[in-house]
């Protein structure tokens, strides 16, 4: 898989925790109807998207967020499929922040976490008209399978290495520190 970790200055990609729930709900609530249609592969109301988002961080799997200037602008979700060594990934990027490398950076973190957990294949599904998602899947190195009314991309992962395990561990320490710092109450200096 190509290295896709280059992200714009002022952007932080980290794991999301329950303390990030309100930011995730806000991101989904701010999606326009076309963005919700692309994300859920069908018409979904703002309320339904917000209801999904309220459980996204606590659901089984992992969720990473991309913060631009301290504001959550994108998330990547890694969800087990039930099949051994396989998982599904999904992305939500705020409309004004697409095409800036956030999806690729989130995809790299998701792929590394999945491979280190023993996952061998990641699946990504999107509508044929969602060209940004197809481009992201291609950038991540996925192979495409066309079927019916959706595009199915499969990303084969190599086994973990000592370096990939070490890097994920270091990233995890920084993720926890960044999340704790963001959740810490602000104390005004007098």
Per-range role (PLM):
Residues 93, 99-114, 121, 131-135, ...:
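Conserved acetyl-CoA-binding loop-helix of GNAT-fold acetyltransferases
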Residues 30, 38-88, 94:
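Acetyl-CoA-dependent GNAT
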Residues 12-23:
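A short beta-loop-alpha structural element at the N-terminal edge
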Residues 1-9, 125-126, 131-190:
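Terminal substrate-recognition subdomain of acyl/acetyltransferases
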Residues 32-37, 111:
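Short strand-loop-strand
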Residues 25-28, 32:
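Hydrophobic alpha-helical core bundles mediating ligand binding, dimerization, or RNAP-core interactions
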């Amino acid at each position: 898989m190509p290295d896709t970790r280059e992200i714009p200055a002022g952007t932080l990609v980290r794991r999301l925790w329950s303390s990030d729930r309100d930011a995730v709900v806000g991101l989904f609530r701010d999606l326009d109807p076309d963005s919700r249609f692309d994300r859920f592969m069908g018409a979904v109301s703002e309320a339904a998207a917000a209801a999904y988002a309220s459980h996204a961080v606590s659901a089984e799997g992992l969720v990473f967020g991309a913060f631009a200037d301290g504001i959550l602008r994108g998330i990547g979700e890694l969800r087990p499929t039930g099949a051994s060594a396989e998982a599904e990934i999904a992305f939500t990027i705020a409309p004004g922040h697409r095409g800036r490398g956030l999806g690729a950076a989130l995809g790299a973190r998701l792929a590394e976490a999945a491979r280190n957990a023993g996952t061998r294949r990641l699946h990504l599904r999107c509508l044929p008209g969602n060209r940004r998602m197809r481009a992201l899947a291609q950038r991540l190195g996925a192979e495409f399978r066309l079927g019916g009314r959706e595009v199915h991309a499969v990303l084969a992962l190599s086994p973990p290495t000592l370096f990939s395990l070490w890097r994920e561990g270091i990233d995890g320490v920084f993720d926890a520190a960044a999340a704790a710092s963001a959740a810490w109450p602000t104390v005004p200096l007098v």
